[in-house]
Amino acid sequence: MARKVVVVDDEKPIADILEFNLKKEGYDVYCAYDGNDAVDLIYEEEPDIVLLDIMLPGRDGMEVCREVRKKYEMPIIMLTAKDSEIDKVLGLELGADDYVTKPFSTRELIARVKANLRRHYSQPAQDTGNVTNEITIKDIVIYPDAYSIKKRGEDIELTHREFELFHYLSKHMGQVMTREHLLQTVWGYDYFGDVRTVDVTIRRLREKIEDDPSHPEYIVTRRGVGYFLQQHE
């Protein structure tokens, strides 16, 4: 079955170009041209991925992202203006998975779509026999096969990307990972040197797993280098 893509952009020529090229790649494509219609369309079609412009009539892209994240975890790629760094950061903090700046290459955007779909919907390897893949770090337990974690027995709700990042760090306990390395391994493609994505995702993770995010006990910053997961006895 073909993957569903919702394209949201108030510039119809851009939406039409994306629709044409995505259909050539075998996707089912649905378009909306304002924020209110976008929310309705996403709820109706429940797509596998959303391409979401920020500047929209009605609700803007940030509001749409916030609303959709209340119910769905599909990847969201934000389409941002060339120099709007604040929009990129806010979009990521609201739960967007990726962003592409305008003007963009259609080929690049389709590559991002494929990468996000591959990362989000890839299935973890099935456990065999009675072997457990659980990873315990102090009072946190990671369940890789279930893509879930618990802290002191309570579920912690993570996005797919947040889980992937935390799980990767847990497999390399105590090793400092540069932002560039994390982009390559966790996101799975080159972010063209923009490492803010990692910082924002780390901040979201800390807010969910740390007792005091301003003094983290799990995800530690090595200033000027990157991040590592602190070992605990």
UniProtKB/Swiss-Prot annotation:
Q: Which domain of life is it from?
A: Bacteria
User: Which keywords has UniProt assigned to this entry?
Assistant: Activator, Cytoplasm, DNA-binding, Phosphoprotein, Transcription, Transcription regulation, Two-component regulatory system
PTM note: Phosphorylated by WalK on Asp-53. Phosphorylated by PknB on Thr-101.
Would you tell me the Gene Ontology cellular component terms? cytosol; protein-DNA complex
* InterPro entries (UniProt xref): CheY-like_superfamily (IPR011006), OmpR/PhoB-type_DNA-bd (IPR001867), Resp_reg_WalR (IPR047791), Sig_transdc_resp-reg_C-effctor (IPR016032), Sig_transdc_resp-reg_receiver (IPR001789), WalR-like (IPR039420), WH-like_DNA-bd_sf (IPR036388)
Task performed by this protein: Member of the two-component regulatory system WalK/WalR that regulates genes involved in cell wall metabolism, virulence regulation, biofilm production, oxidative stress resistance and antibiotic resistance via direct or indirect regulation of autolysins. Functions as a transcription regulator by direct binding to promoter regions.
User: What more does the record tell us?
Assistant: Overexpression of walK/walR reduces susceptibility against vancomycin.
The name on file for this protein is: Transcriptional regulatory protein WalR
Q: Tell me the organism.
A: Staphylococcus aureus
